[in-house]
Amino acid sequence: MHANEMRECAHDDLVEHVQNIVDKFCDERITEDRIRQWRISRGVPEAEYRAFYESELGKYCLPPMAGGFDGPFIARAALVARLMRRAGATMPYLTDMNSMALLSTMRILSQQEIAEDLMSCNGRVAFSQAFSEGGQGESGSVTTEVTVDEGGIFLDGVKTFVANGQYIPRTLVYTRDMVNGTADGGVSLWLVPIDEPGVSTFPLNTVGQEMLAPARIEFEHVKLNPDWQIQTEGKLSQMLERQYELGRILICASSLGLAQAAMDDVLERCATHVSHGRNLGGIPQIQQKVADMAVRVRAMDMLVTRAAESISNGADADQQHLDCALMKYYVPKAATEVASEALQIFGGVGYTDDARVGRIWRDCRGNQIAQGTDEIMPHTVAKMLIKNCASRLVDF
């Protein structure tokens, strides 16, 4: 057996193990009534976080230096997909997974310092990510700014769509910084406590993904402690590029799980529901929709697995970029289409809270925007494919 085949077998066993422990946790902790309540309350109770971190699942949201899982990234993608499938909703543990992904891109000393600080704070290595700004599509056009005067270092600006921004004690702020960020082209990262004077948080009433509790955070001349700056040593651009790829895998794994949940609900309804004296699953038009949905779900699974394995196996950087871009271009949109067809098959009840498919559609739709919109992915895909072709022609 070749090395790649051995890795694939090992990954298959690991994925199956992760899926089993997710199923066990969901059987014990997650019900449809609880999901509905948590959506209304914009998050899960603290007791549920404790239960998650005390279970075997908790180690997948922790870095190795904090006792977390030290293995291929595909295991974390499998966890996200299975959890979203079982819940039929976007669970807030996704924020913790994104924190872990971003932390893994930092230098080891920074990882250790941040992990120790956060673990002592609330037992979780989690921070919100204050990167997005209203109307600012490119990170290079960020307007949040760090300034320095005789009184110290100060932060001013507004960030939006900060997942769990009101509830996680620290937020990682991406900002213009012409003094401390010169090595990175005038930008820097700061891990800021949200209870500091001058920090204000406000809820965002999004149409989906309620348990992520998105927020707007305003920084009004917040005095910064120099120790809060993340030391990037001129490698911030590479760090963020890596984080985007890991984050996109997690987002697409979430989309995959949501689409699988919609498919599960459709198959059950087709097998049990009778319409005008006919079994729903026996109607040719419904069969066509089910077949189309199955193809999309299968393709999504393949793309997510390919991208996650590319990262896990340490493929060359260009291959990782291509696999992640192809995945992000296709998966979120396909998930939304699957959920939309599920809603159509359910009919009127699908447009109410009596069925999960409506909220699944709303959650899927948000993932077409998160971690890079659908529209920007073709640029990366085409560029990488043409580059690979040009390289082969030169070698030939």
Q: What is the role of each PLM region?
A:
Residues 156-202:
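A short core secondary-structure module
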Residues 33-40, 271-278, 297-330, 343-348:
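C-terminal helix-coil-helix/basic helical segment that borders enzyme active sites and/or dimer interfaces
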Residues 7-9, 201-298, 325, 367, ...:
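Glycine-rich beta->alpha junctions and the first turn(s) of the following alpha-helix
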Residues 54-124, 163-170, 311, 362:
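Internal helix-loop-helix
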Residues 144-147:
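A structural signal for short hydrophobic beta-strand segments in well-ordered beta-sheet cores
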Residues 160-165, 246-248, 366-373:
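Glycine-rich phosphate/pyrophosphate-binding beta-alpha loops
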Residues 123-132, 173:
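A short, Trp-centered hydrophobic/proline-enriched beta-strand micro-motif
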Residues 2-7, 79, 346-396:
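Glycine-rich phosphate/cofactor-binding loops in nucleotide/flavin-utilizing enzymes
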